[in-house]
């Protein structure tokens, strides 16, 4: 970095104060967000009543999808259930031993779908790969796990197929609990696009059932599950005795989403009671600032996922970078002008550095931007990270409070299940969520309990298959 000139320190502190004002929402701002979100939620329910599974973005920014899940576990269930967790280049087969009293044991097997041994460059993700090839991997993975656990022989001898939940984290139109049509691939998947054996437009439950039959796997797909819904269900089973029932689920990680139990679901045309909101796309009356606008304008999906861009780990690093360039002005490192040159994980490392010398933070910035900052400058970066993460926690907490209110449980008590690395891995983030919950909810905050649903997607899918 360029050495300080006379007056630079005062300018830097003044700009930092501007960023602090931008990134510190007042209680009044959060209450306005709370009301705006509830109004948009209501518009979404009315949209679903009119149009069913068809999303009409002009009527609601959130999709408000029917999960088709009605039955939630109590924690007393016992037995074995399986899940296939598929949402990226790695697929997992998961076996849950439900022990009752909210306890469970997990074993799992993983496969990499970007296989170097596959004939196509991107493995089973490649556009020239066929759908049967991909779904055969799922069937073989779960068969191997069933064999290893002894369940395969038992199911064959008793002619009793095991229930399987299928976490399929791609855009789908859910027609029933065990019927979901892939709208389009995301996350780099193109399977079947240049192969007669396509996947897009097909019912993934049928594709899985066919693969299980081809490989003689005594299993039946009971449910297609979104990872956010799985989080709610997982915490419904594992919540601490004496705490309220889980009625809200959040993902706060690379992305953001929310689901909740809608008390009037049937009145709005839902077959289940759990609504998958796709809340990352919420954008009505958001308290955005000029830094947020700059970040959004340079994304590939400008104008979309606006709430997610304020909260999720994927965008936090970019918000920190843009804020830092503003604060340091002409002294900003050259590499700081490169988009995504600091990631959310790096910003988290800096925020987590409570040492006096900030050695970990200095090293993190050196790796990102190729400069060694002095202590004053690195403390400035640390403060920017704190502000951005705290605002994320404030907005996430506000939505959690709003959803507890919508479920009708704010006064009597509700548990909020949360998964996602940003929340699960960082105690300081969880503490910030608690702080802002109290700020928004006031005395009612004592009725809101947060539950970590580590691996909610796998556990939740297995539980849904077991109880629905």
Curated annotation (Swiss-Prot):
Disulfide bonds: none annotated. It is an enzyme of class 2 (transferase). Residues 163-189 are annotated as: Glucose-binding. Gene3D superfamilies: 3.30.420.40, 3.40.367.20. CDD domains: ASKHA_NBD_HK. Residues 10-466 form the Hexokinase domain. GO terms for cellular component: cytosol; mitochondrion. It catalyses: a D-hexose + ATP = a D-hexose 6-phosphate + ADP + H(+); D-mannose + ATP = D-mannose 6-phosphate + ADP + H(+); D-fructose + ATP = D-fructose 6-phosphate + ADP + H(+); D-glucose + ATP = D-glucose 6-phosphate + ADP + H(+). Pathway: Carbohydrate metabolism; hexose metabolism; Carbohydrate degradation; glycolysis; D-glyceraldehyde 3-phosphate and glycerone phosphate from D-glucose: step 1/4. GO terms for biological process: glucose metabolic process; glycolytic process; intracellular glucose homeostasis. It holds the Pfam family Hexokinase_2. GO terms for molecular function: ATP binding; D-glucose binding; fructokinase activity; glucokinase activity; mannokinase activity. ATP binds at residues 85-90. Its EC number is 2.7.1.1. Keywords: ATP-binding, Glycolysis, Kinase, Nucleotide-binding, Transferase. The keyword ATP-binding applies. PANTHER family: HEXOKINASE, HEXOKINASE TYPE 1-RELATED. Belongs to the hexokinase family. Catalyzes the phosphorylation of various hexoses to hexose 6-phosphate. This is Hexokinase. It comes from Toxoplasma gondii.
């Amino acid at each position: 970095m360029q050495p300080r000139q006379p007056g630079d320190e005062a300018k830097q502190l003044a700009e930092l104060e501007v960023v602090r004002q931008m990134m510190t929402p007042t209680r009044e701002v959060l209450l306005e967000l709370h009301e705006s979100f509830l109004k948009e939620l209501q518009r979404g329910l009315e949209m679903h009543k009119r149009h069913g599974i068809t999303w009409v973005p002009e009527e609601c920014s959130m999709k408000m999808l029917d999960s088709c899940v009605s039955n939630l576990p109590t924690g007393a269930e016992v037995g074995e259930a399986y899940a296939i967790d598929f949402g990226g280049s790695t697929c997992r087969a998961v076996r849950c031993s439900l022990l009752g009293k909210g306890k469970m044991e997990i074993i799992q097997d993983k496969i990499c779908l970007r296989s170097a041994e596959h004939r196509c460059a991107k493995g089973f993700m490649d556009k020239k790969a066929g759908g049967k090839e991909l779904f055969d991997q799922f069937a073989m993975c779960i068969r191997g796990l069933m064999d290893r656990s002894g369940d395969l022989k038992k199911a064959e001898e008793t002619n009793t197929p095991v229930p399987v939940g299928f976490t399929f984290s791609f855009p789908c139109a859910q027609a029933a609990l065990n019927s979901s049509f892939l709208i389009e691939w995301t996350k780099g998947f193109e399977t079947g696009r240049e192969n007669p054996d396509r996947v897009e437009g097909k019912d993934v439950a049928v594709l899985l059932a066919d693969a299980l039959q081809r490989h003689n796997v005594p299993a039946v797909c009971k449910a297609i599950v979104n990872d956010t819904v799985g989080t709610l269900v997982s915490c419904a089973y594992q919540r601490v005795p004496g705490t309220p029932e889980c009625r809200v689920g959040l993902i706060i990680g690379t992305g953001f989403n929310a689901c909740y139990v809608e008390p009037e679901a049937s009145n709005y045309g839902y077959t289940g009671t759990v609504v998958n909101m796709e809340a990352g796309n919420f954008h009505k009356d958001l308290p955005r600032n000029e830094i947020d606008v700059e970040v959004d304008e340079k994304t590939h999906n400008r104008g979309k996922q606006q709430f997610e861009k304020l909260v999720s780990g994927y965008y936090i690093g970019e918000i920190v970078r843009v804020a830092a360039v503003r604060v340091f002005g002409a002294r900003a490192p050259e590499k700081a002008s490169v988009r995504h040159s600091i990631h959310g994980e790096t910003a988290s490392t800096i925020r987590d550095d409570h040492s006096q010398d900030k050695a970990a933070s200095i090293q993190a910035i050196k790796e990102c931007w190729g400069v060694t900052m002095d202590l004053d400058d690195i403390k400035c970066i640390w403060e920017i990270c704190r502000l951005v993460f705290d605002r994320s926690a404030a907005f996430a907490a506000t939505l959690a409070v709003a959803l507890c209110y919508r479920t009708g449980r704010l006064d009597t008590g509700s548990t909020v299940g949360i998964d996602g690395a940003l929340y699960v891995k960082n105690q300081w983030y969880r503490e910030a969520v608690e702080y802002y919950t109290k700020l928004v909810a006031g005395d009612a905050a004592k009725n809101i309990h947060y539950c970590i649903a580590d691996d909610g997607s796998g556990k939740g899918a297995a539980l849904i298959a077991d109880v629905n």
